């Protein structure tokens, strides 16, 4: 059984990006820049932002941190986004979600320049994904696809089941899996809370993608022998972090599986860095 190591893969990606950025700055080009906007003092968001800033430093990306109080008004936040849109040294803008109550997250995401939307949340980038056009892809599904490529797990002609239909993971992942190519061309089923027989659908999957946020929802008896299981879920339980899969029983059936932690999670930040460097390449070419 193959354990798909997202932590090691993310380290490899950061090293590759660092080599590129170091070479470019040695030639006199400016470093990539990422604006990180955090509103309020949500503890989890603060941890996420620190991790992203640390990863930026490791790669050579300049991180512009904006930490705003929870009382920040909508217009003040929109003005800051407009300022970041206009800054030539900012290649990507990351608005840490969730926002405090009273702020319209959708309006703020709409205000971000799609060319700097390295989170891939802007409707223009979502539309580009659905049409198969170039654009920024949401970091978690992009990380999943990168793991499939780097571990040479092609989905062409396979049956893929995505459990979860969120706008951030489930839906974009399903779109990526249906794109033409060796790591696409899958026949995709999306399951959710209203799916009549989830176990039956999961057992049909050659590739099973879990992104529902329910600890150990999927057990070994729900998985086909030899399936590839990609567990996007990160849940807190009495005995620590766990995924949407019951790892102990599912790993006995799977041909390959991502652990939690150490699977998809590290890839999300890695792909944020990839998107930022991609924007920088385009803007400094």
Swiss-Prot record:
Function: Catalyzes the oxidation of 5,10-methylenetetrahydrofolate to 5,10-methenyltetrahydrofolate and then the hydrolysis of 5,10-methenyltetrahydrofolate to 10-formyltetrahydrofolate.
Cleaved signal peptide residues: none
Annotated Gene3D superfamilies: Leucine Dehydrogenase, chain A, domain 1 (3.40.50.10860), NAD(P)-binding Rossmann-like Domain (3.40.50.720)
Binding site for NADP(+): 164-166, 193, 234
Keyword match RNA-binding: no
Disulfide bonds: none
EC number(s) given by UniProt: 1.5.1.5, 3.5.4.9
Protein name as catalogued: Bifunctional protein FolD
A single cellular component GO annotation: cytosol
Alphabetized GO MF terms: methenyltetrahydrofolate cyclohydrolase activity; methylenetetrahydrofolate dehydrogenase (NADP+) activity
Reactions accelerated catalytically: (6R)-5,10-methylene-5,6,7,8-tetrahydrofolate + NADP(+) = (6R)-5,10-methenyltetrahydrofolate + NADPH; (6R)-5,10-methenyltetrahydrofolate + H2O = (6R)-10-formyltetrahydrofolate + H(+)
Pfam families recorded: THF_DHG_CYH, THF_DHG_CYH_C
HAMAP family from the UniProt entry: THF_DHG_CYH
Subunit structure comment from the entry: Homodimer.
């Amino acid at each position: 059984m193959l354990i798909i190591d997202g932590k090691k893969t993310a380290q490899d990606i950061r090293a590759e990006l660092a080599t590129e950025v170091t070479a470019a700055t040695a030639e006199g080009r400016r470093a990539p820049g990422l604006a990180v906007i955090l509103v309020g003092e949500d503890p989890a968001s603060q941890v996420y932002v620190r991790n992203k800033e640390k990863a930026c430093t490791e790669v050579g990306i300049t991180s512009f941190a904006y930490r705003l109080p929870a009382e920040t008004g909508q217009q003040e936040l929109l003005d800051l986004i407009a300022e970041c849109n206009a800054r030539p040294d900012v290649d990507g803008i990351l608005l840490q979600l969730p926002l405090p109550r009273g702020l319209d997250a959708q309006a703020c995401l709409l205000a971000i320049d799609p060319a700097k939307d390295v989170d891939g949340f802007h409707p223009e980038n979502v539309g580009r994904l659905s049409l198969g056009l170039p654009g920024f892809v949401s970091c978690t599904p992009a990380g999943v696809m990168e793991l499939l490529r780097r571990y040479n797990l092609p989905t062409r002609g396979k049956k893929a089941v995505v459990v979860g239909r969120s706008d951030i993971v489930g839906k974009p992942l399903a779109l990526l899996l249906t794109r033409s190519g060796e790591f696409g061309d899958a026949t995709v089923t999306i399951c959710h809370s209203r799916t009549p027989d989830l176990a039956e659908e999961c057992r049909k999957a050659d590739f099973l993608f879990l992104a529902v946020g329910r600890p150990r929802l999927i057990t070994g008896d729900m998985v086909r022998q030899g399936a590839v299981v990609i567990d996007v879920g990160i849940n807190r339980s009495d005995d620590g972090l766990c995924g949407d899969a019951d790892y102990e029983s599912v790993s006995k059936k799977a041909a390959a599986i991502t652990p939690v932690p150490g699977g998809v999670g590290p890839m999300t930040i890695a792909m944020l860095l990839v998107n930022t460097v991609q924007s920088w390449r385009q803007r400094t070419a």
